[in-house]
Curated annotation (Swiss-Prot):
Origin superkingdom: Eukaryota
Region (Disordered): 1-117, 153-172, 210-266
Skewed-composition ranges (Acidic residues): 51-70
Species name: Caenorhabditis elegans
Biased composition (Low complexity): 100-112, 153-167, 241-265
Name of the protein described by the UniProt record: Uncharacterized protein F10E9.3
Basic and acidic residues compositional bias, start-end: 12-23
Length: 362
């Protein structure tokens, strides 16, 4: 037990001695740094043996170009930092003052920019690698403080985040010109829609409702199907035949030829008088005909004739005076065409028959 306590005490003494030596070394180190605060020694260029002598002065020109490049890079870095510091300031007054005032250049900022922003390092520091870096005595650059987004959006020359606000166009393009008096009165009554840009007078959309189509109450009346509408102007009103003026069908007891005119003298169309003006039409079926050329027998021709008679009778019973008038006019026209030119008659009759069968016209 005694040996263990002796060993522990000896180890504790050794640790204390080591700590004292470390503290003494730390106190000596800053003293040496204070002694070495002086400028680095200037190294003179050794005289060459004649092998690398600049006979034409090329070395001097290269040194001058390097110095010019260093000065140019310094000025560029200064302008960039000044622009950034102006943009991220918080007060509007300081921003305006800095924009209006010329940029200030000082030797301290040039030195710091040259060391921190890629400027050229002196040759003495490059050659003497063992030398410690000299602490800069210039004050540090002021830290940039970011302004809030609201402040940046309200600052002049910057675009706001909200594109829908009307102040965006004013800041971007300036104040729009005043609206003429002639347009002010129209704009009060008609819907106004803004133009594509914030400049220029507003476009006035004309109301698409036609004023001359409105009633006294301001409503658009419904027009009947018999009224022709041509570009907003009321067209021809077709006359309607009242049901009292229409004569009864031929199957009801009175024929078209013997019936008297029941139309009034008010200009209403009289179908019976028009039927009397037409030449009489004989609806008959010829038995026989060209059955031999077509290869049909007499029995087939008789069946076809009976079917035609039935269809003609059905049409006559179901038709009115209007249908009879239209049919008689068509048949009379075909007869005149046949007497004039048979080729035209065959072409027209075939086209007419195809239309009748296509649209199922009775």
């Amino acid at each position: 037990m005694a040996s263990k306590t002796r060993r522990g005490s000896s180890l504790a003494k050794k640790e204390k001695e080591i700590k004292k030596e470390i503290e003494e070394d730390k106190e000596v180190a800053p003293i040496q740094e204070e002694d070495d605060d002086g400028p680095p020694p200037i190294l003179e260029r050794e005289a060459s043996c004649g092998e690398n002598d600049d006979t034409d002065g090329d070395g001097k020109e290269e040194d001058a170009q390097k110095e010019d490049d260093i000065d140019g890079s310094k000025t560029k870095n200064e302008s960039i930092l000044e622009a950034l510091s102006q943009f991220f300031t918080a007060d509007d007054a300081t921003v305006k003052n800095r924009r209006n005032s010329p940029p200030s250049e000082s030797s301290s900022t040039r030195n710091t920019l040259g060391l921190n922003r890629g400027g050229a390092i002196p040759k003495a520091l490059l050659l003497n690698k063992n030398l410690r870096p000299v602490p800069s005595k210039t004050p540090p650059i002021a830290t940039t403080r970011f302004a809030s987004l609201r402040h940046l959006s309200s600052a002049p020359g910057t675009s706001a985040s909200t594109s829908g606000s009307p102040s965006v166009g004013i800041r971007k393009y300036g104040v729009p010109p005043p609206m003429p008096r002639s347009l002010r009165n129209i704009a009060g009554s008609i819907n106004v829609v803004g133009s594509n840009s914030s400049l220029g007078p507003a476009r006035l959309l004309e109301s698409r409702k036609r004023h001359f189509d409105k009633d006294k109450d301001g409503k658009n009346p419904k027009r009947s199907s018999l009224v022709a509408y041509n570009g907003g102007r009321a067209g021809e009103n077709f006359r309607k035949v009242p049901p009292s003026a229409v004569s009864p069908a031929p199957g009801s007891g009175s024929s078209a030829s013997s019936g008297t005119s029941t139309s009034s003298s008010n200009g209403i169309i009289d179908v019976q008088s028009m039927l009397r003006d037409q030449s009489p039409v004989r609806m008959q079926v010829m038995v026989g005909g060209d059955h031999e050329t077509n290869g049909d027998s007499i029995q087939e021709a008789m069946e076809l004739a009976n079917a035609q008679k039935e269809s003609i009778g059905n049409i006559a019973r179901a038709s009115s005076h209007h249908n009879m008038l239209l049919g008689s006019m068509i048949i009379n026209g075909l007869n005149t065409l046949q007497s004039r030119d048979k080729d035209e008659y065959t072409n027209f009759s075939s086209d007419l028959f195809s239309l009748i069968t296509r649209y199922n016209i009775n």
